[in-house]
């Protein structure tokens, strides 16, 4: 599945067969995304983006050299993203320390790698995946319709919230399928589309779904709980980079989950990864810096869309 995804992005699938040293940290691990009925709100902001990733590369650098490079106080025991940059993404780009961080990567031929999960996006795409024939399209069309559907739902979160509550999503009763899909279609028709958007195609798919007797991925699930198991992203990395060495920052929940249910491929338990304390491992510390800026970047473009480049340009010219 990962090789198909890689090919869809026009990247050679041989890349994931390589041996790489991959260091990881995470940001925005929300554990769970659900609707809190008593407080009448989601437990976390719906536009939260979970990022898992860090530095790819051989070699290392000692903490004293990093403190000197970033001009940090002697009392600093480990480098964290807040030492390097602060504020929204456009503000972070003005940071001299961020520039030094990027120079360090270039000088050592290190790269930033990451996997991300947009909480709202992953909570709603199961609706489209439940429509007969939807996933049989070419990958580009699948991604296009999912992205458009996400924009529609994100633009009217209060209506989406009401639908989750009304239909106990993602535990929709079979007799409510038509009404649920019709409500989604109504939301889609209200959205202010850009030219070139495939809104008619999206509505057509939802119409098809409204005629189904079941929506397999959004029924018989725990109601009002849209996302659990962020360990799946860890599992995906481990089973994708099967020939590589993965060094991950200690995450107690993930370690416990893996002990209960080891990561395996074709029945073979994988041992290409290890969890470490970030304090003595500067590459994991640098991974915290990497995922932090990636997270800010992804959030920035999610908020500003096509205006992102203009806003960044204006910010840098101030």
Question: How would you label these PLM feature ranges?
Answer:
Residues 1-318:
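Phosphate-ester processing/binding pockets and catalytic centers
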